[in-house]
Regions:
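Membrane-proximal interfacial segments on either side of biological membranes
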Residues: 1-273
């Protein structure tokens, strides 16, 4: 690390220069970056974007303004905006010890704010993944720099490629498109503690819909037996099957998860019809 930080509590606004050869945040390795900022009184203002290499891509801090810095008895408040460019989901999930994802994330983080130890994104987060679109709303992180941060968010998934998704998770091949609604997500210490998610085939989609034998077997383990219309002997004969729709609902509360799908006449449910 090298540079010069000048701070004036008077009328002058000196410019600080700082170069960082490398760092880490939440186990994420961060590459070399530099910054130019103005320090005046209890305010810090970024003068030009900071571009930080991270997990195969870049995170750019486009704007940043903090007030209450180093002021006695005052909690700092800051506002910022940032962007993500080609951040590797595979590397990110590996470092955070999450289930492995493939692909990259490119998106905008607007109206970011930190106050009273709570980080929020007022404008939401839009990015692309698995050849579809993901929007995250109502994102907040309580005590983000503490030992047990609490993340809350809602999200919508639109037009995700099931082929890309199932190949990433080695679940067994499924072809088609997938929509989803994730409500009341809560991560405690970056581990899932609560959520409700509905995953389903979008209406009007003309994408090819095929499901492999392995995927049927894995869904069968999640559900309550062989899907209606299929027998164990048929599973051994055919490698792939056509399907009409997918409908999967999962609710997690603590260590208890509940699974549901499309209602069947016999009182059960379909995960794949």
């Amino acid at each position: 690390r090298d540079g010069r930080v000048a701070w004036d509590w008077g009328a002058g606004v000196p410019v600080a220069h700082l170069g960082v050869s490398g760092a880490g945040l939440y186990r994420l390795p961060i590459g070399r970056f530099s910054l130019r900022a103005a320090f005046s009184g209890d305010r810090i203002a970024l003068l030009e974007p900071i571009v930080v290499p991270v997990v195969g891509g870049e995170v750019a801090l486009d704007s940043f303004l903090m007030s209450g810095a180093l002021a006695a008895g005052v909690r700092p408040v800051w506002n910022a905006s940032a962007s993500l460019r080609d951040v590797s989901l595979e590397q990110l999930t590996q470092v955070l010890e999450w289930p492995p994802f493939g692909g990259v994330v490119t998106g905008q983080l607007r109206e970011m704010r930190y106050a009273d130890q709570v980080f929020t994104i007022g404008g939401g987060l839009d990015f692309s993944a698995f050849d579809g679109d993901v929007r995250v709303d109502d994102l907040s992180i309580q005590d983000p720099l503490g030992s047990v941060p609490i993340l809350r968010a809602n999200a919508t998934l639109r037009g995700l490629s099931l082929e890309a998704l199932t190949q990433t998770f080695s679940f067994g091949l499924i072809e088609g498109r997938l929509d989803g609604d994730l409500d009341d997500l809560q991560l405690v210490g970056w581990q899932p503690a609560h959520f409700s998610v509905h995953l389903y085939t979008p209406q009007g989609s003309d994408a090819r819909r095929r499901i492999s034998q392995r995927a049927v077997e894995n869904l069968t383990e999640l559900g309550s037996g062989i899907p209606a219309g299929l027998s164990a002997s048929m599973l051994q004969v055919f490698d792939q099957f056509r399907y009409n729709s997918i409908d999967l609902r999962v609710s997690l509360d603590g260590e208890v998860a509940q699974l549901d799908g499309l209602a069947r006449p016999d009182g059960g449910y379909y995960l794949v019809k």
